[in-house]
Amino acid sequence: MSNVTWTGGEEHWIQKGDIRLFMWQKKASSKVPHAGTIFFVHGSSMASQPTFDLYVPGRPYSSAMDWFSDHGFDTWTMDNEGYGRSDKHRDINFDISNGADDLAVGSQYILDKTGATSLLMYGISSGALKAALFTERHPERVAKLALDAFVWTGEGSHTLDQRKKKLPEFLAQNRRPIDRDFVHSIFKRDHPDTTDAVTVNAFADAILTLDDSMPTGTYVDMCSKLPLLDPTKITVSSIILRGEYDGIAGMDDLIDFYKLLPNMNKQFSVMRGISHASFQQKNYMMVYHILNSFYTMPEPAYQG
C-alpha cells in the first residue's frame, strides 16, 4: 500500500468541547467569479480527504475540491469525530446525530472564518443523513442542500437488507475493521463496471492511510433507527442525487421523501451509470456538472 499525502489546501483544527476535529480547505480560484462556499460531508467508511480530495493518475479532477475551487467555490470538508485525523478516543460509536453536532461546530467556524452568510451543503450516504439533520437543526446556515446516495426509511434498500444481517455485530462494538477488500466491495455490490480498478485502488490507498477501522454508529442508525429525519422540517432548496444502480435506497423511498420537502425550489436527479460513491465512478464529471448547476442556479424571480 502507498501512503497518501495531501497538498494544495489548508489544515484547520477546531474544538467541539474537548474534542479536536480536523478540517481541510481549498480556496476558490481568484481567476473566476466567486460562486459560494461548499461544505462536503463524508460517509460511513472513509474520511473526508480520500472522498473529496482524491488524486488518481490520468483521471483529471478526481478531487472534487479541486474542480469546484477552480470553478469559483471556496471548498471545505471535515473528518467527523471517530474518522481520519479527528479525535477517536471516546468510548462511543459516533452516530449520525454526533456527526451532525460536528457539522454545527464546523459550519460556524467556516462562517466566522470566511465571512460567508450561508453554506452550500453536500453529503453522501450517511454523510447525507448528517447534512440533512444538521440542516433541520440550523436552516439559517444553509443556502442549498445536496443529498447524494441518501436513504430515508430504508424501505427497498438492498444494501441495508444485507447489512442488517450483521447488526448484532455492529451493536457489540464501537468500531469495525476495514481493509482493501472491503473498499473494493463497495464498488462490487451494486454494478461493478461503474468504476475502474486504478481509481478504486487509489481510493483504498487514501482511506487506509488514515484508518484501519471505522465507527459502527452510522451503520447501527441506518440498519435499526431510520427514519432519522422529517422532510417537512428541511426548508431550504434541496436536490436528491440517486445513482442509477445504487442499492442504498429504494427509488420509492426517495420519491416519498422528495414529495414532502416544502421548498418548491427542489430537484431530483437520477445519475445514469452510477452506483454508490459517485465521485469515484467513471461518470464522476456528470455529478460535478449536476451539482454545479444546482449550486449556481439563480433564485426564482417569481415565487407565487
Predicted regions mapped to residue ranges:
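Short, surface-exposed "cap/lid" segments of acyl-processing enzymes
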Residues: 30-73
